[in-house]
Amino acid sequence: MPTPHTQQAYDPEGNFTMRWTRADIRQIVAQSHTAGADKNSLPQALTMPDIPQDFPLINSNVWVWDTWPLADLRANQLSYKGWEVIFSLTADPHAGYTFDDRHVHARIGFFYRRAGIPASQRPANGGWTWGGHLFPDGASARVFGTAPMTNNAEWSGSARLTNGSNVSLYYTATSFNRSAPGGADITPPQAIITRADGHIHADDKHVWFSGFDDHKALLQPDGNYYQTGQQNTYFSFRDPFVFTDPAHPGKTYMVFEGNTGGQRGARTCTEADLGYAPNDPYKEDLNAVMNSGAVYQKANVGLAVATNPQLTEWKFLPPILSANCVDDQTERPQIYLKDGKYYLFTISHRTTMAAGVDGPDGVYGFVGNGIRSDFQPLNGGSGLVLGNPTDFSAPAGAPYSQDPNQNPREFQSYSHYVMPGGLVESFIDAIGPRRGGTLAPTVKVGINGTSTAVDRTYGRGGLGGYGDIPANLPATGAGHNDGNSQ
């Protein structure tokens, strides 16, 4: 049975961290079934609908993956002068590296399309026009000063429209210093949560940006709450999502992906991380769990608060969620308010989960009464919200080397982002042998208290338009600095 969680809210600047436990995550398999001919173990209500293998490309000259909208500080998605605008991690499919090597070459780019057109009336690929790279060449690399590097990449974050036309882009500046492309690290990779500001412009024909020349380093891992590259070459520190909380007016917060501070593989997992009741017949032995290698999986969701009104100075707070001996990646976290509740959504991979637990690539979610809560994992305590169809009896494989016994859509979508109204966008990774690098069809998830379900009446069989990322409010000038875009 899952660990009891109360949803109780705590002071955001307090030190309570909700533990996503092994007892919680093991509910995924407990609530699943033996896969039949469909090669899917998951309940249908939690399964991403099958994406056709003949999917269209958003743009044949750009690989696209993590994507986020132009938004305000309350995550309303804004149209600007009649245009919808999105930002994506992009790479060049013609540059000679493979799709799986794209991460060290990632640049943030943008796309735009006219607002207010139903998906059914748009081109099959969503109708987005490629606007180009957002930042001037080399601007991101300057935050690293004289540190040696062979590659600089721009990783995910969030875009906030403030004060009319100002766009603050919070993102992850990364650098790599390797002996050869794909080779060994000479020095550990670096990741710095960074902000750059520019201005959006639009006329009746297109959208463009100016600025983004100056990049300000905001946060680097401290080694205490959040693991550093010196502690673990495989550390995670990325994906800033910046927001305001109506319960704490005047404050601006950021959630991000981290790992628990300390040396990689340290035997620091506790009985509380396992989370079993004393009489649970499925209770595991702590030493056996740590001996299994689960000590290498220690994800967390971090929290920071701005300490000045300009949002250029930030301080770490303790993480709001830990997944010690459970999972190693809780990517692209976001806070989502609905019906007075605070939902924490994040994404993860089957291959980053600890030995002895299992779950699909997809979205995981938790609900509480504040941004720091004893979050209750959704859907029977497991946390699973939306997973790719997966056969738990077959090995995971990899997007570039799929197991023949596995569901061919195990890697069909990833990097999901939950939008207003329960819409969820993502990108296509691999469907059978065909690789993606383009936006997936949007789906809709009904969110009701502690449970969610895919709406299969949405679109066609549950699949909406490819890359359908609609604005829910127009940008109306003043007010974006506090998120009140009314």
Features from the language model and the residues they span:
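Carbohydrate-active catalytic/glycan-binding domains of CAZyme proteins
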Residues: 1-486
